[in-house]
Amino acid sequence: MLDLKAVAADFESFERRLARRGEGAVQALAPVKPLAARRRELNVLLEKQKKEQADANARIRELARTDKGAVEGARASLRALGDEVKKTEAELGEVEAELTRLLMLVPNPPHDSVPDGKDEHDNVVVKTWGEQKAYGFTPKPHWEVGEALGVLEWQQAAKLSGSRFTILKGAAARLERAIVSFFIDVHTSRGYTEILPPYLVTGETMTGTGQLPKFEEDLFKTTNEPPMYLIPTAEVPVTNMHRDEIFEASAMPVSYCAFSPCFRAEAGSAGRDTRGIMRQHQFHKVELVKLSKAEESYAEHEKMLDDACEVLRRLGLHHRVSLLCTGDMGFSSAKTYDIEVWCPGQGAYREISSVSNCEDFQARRIRVRYRGENGKPRLAHTLNGSGVAVGRTIVAILEQCQEADGTVVIPEPLRPYMGGLERIAAETFPRGVER
């Protein structure tokens, strides 16, 4: 959430910065201006009324000594003035509540280093690791590879849960567990503390990281009141862990990694990635979260990006990094890198991680701070990134590591987690006859 005082003091500056995101961001900010002006008027009026109250109280004390007959009339005037103060305070409270509601719908202005653009086609590739492998055959997409091996099952998953769900069997299920353990081991070795968070959170927690109120249609929630929400990413509970806390500067940065299932309604994704496991309602991810000093957050952002890329480098998976343009950034982010892994069976680079610096946008909502050099509490900067998506790592392995005979070579770092298994070969599983 934006700082109301800063917005009110220089509305045009925020308007210009948000215009880089598109007209929608400017429109979201527009209603704030007249309400902020009314808030200023009410604060001035309230200050005037309270001074009049103080003067009236002083006059009553003076009359009690000099003219007791006039005291009752003065008290009646004071009561009327008190009613006016209450009326002004009530309107001010309503205005401030509406301003807070409106600011919850305004996205984070982009950092100056973010390129202007409308959508993903305007993103800028900033680095590449590895090369596209040359195959002596036409590589298949992961859904064909997984189906031929018998380790990815969609028909039974649809019977259980509907579309956008998958059952992993045999070596694929083992591969998923291996990837999670490998990712956590790498990140903890690089200074992250492992967290296993709750998967159901409150509406306040979802609001803290920016999913609510704007993106409720993308979330799954329970039917009880008040509802609980299934997390779309471990960023939500982990970032909120330190809500209403103040850190000493010496404790910063605070670095966490967390494995969790993620649940997303995928509203607006009809017709996209309907085959395979790229876009699921339920998937696993290892998330990286940092709380940083404001002046160090962009250095920490680059470190987090490197940490996310490190797991892919160790697995030998060719990938590239793109700096997202203003039109493709997430709501809470000031700057985002996407890590895109090469999928030869699809002939495309596909996102496997987003690494974002949200500056103080989330911290203002959750009120997480640290003591600056002068000892005064200052809002922390929050950073998050996938380290990385587990299902999409399986996609990359099935496509990049496939062989002409249909088997898939398991990257060496994962083999100790899979009992030394070196490749995935076709498996047969028990199955009855549909009736």
Curated annotation (Swiss-Prot):
Keywords: Aminoacyl-tRNA synthetase, ATP-binding, Cytoplasm, Ligase, Nucleotide-binding, Protein biosynthesis. This is Serine--tRNA ligase. One of its GO terms (biological process) is selenocysteine biosynthetic process. One of its GO terms (cellular component) is cytoplasm. Catalyzes the attachment of serine to tRNA(Ser). Is also able to aminoacylate tRNA(Sec) with serine, to form the misacylated tRNA L-seryl-tRNA(Sec), which will be further converted into selenocysteinyl-tRNA(Sec). Its main location: cytoplasm. Pathway: Aminoacyl-tRNA biosynthesis; selenocysteinyl-tRNA(Sec) biosynthesis; L-seryl-tRNA(Sec) from L-serine and tRNA(Sec): step 1/1. ATP binds at R264, A265, E266, E351, I352, S353, S354. Consists of two distinct domains, a catalytic core and a N-terminal extension that is involved in tRNA binding. Its EC number is 6.1.1.11.
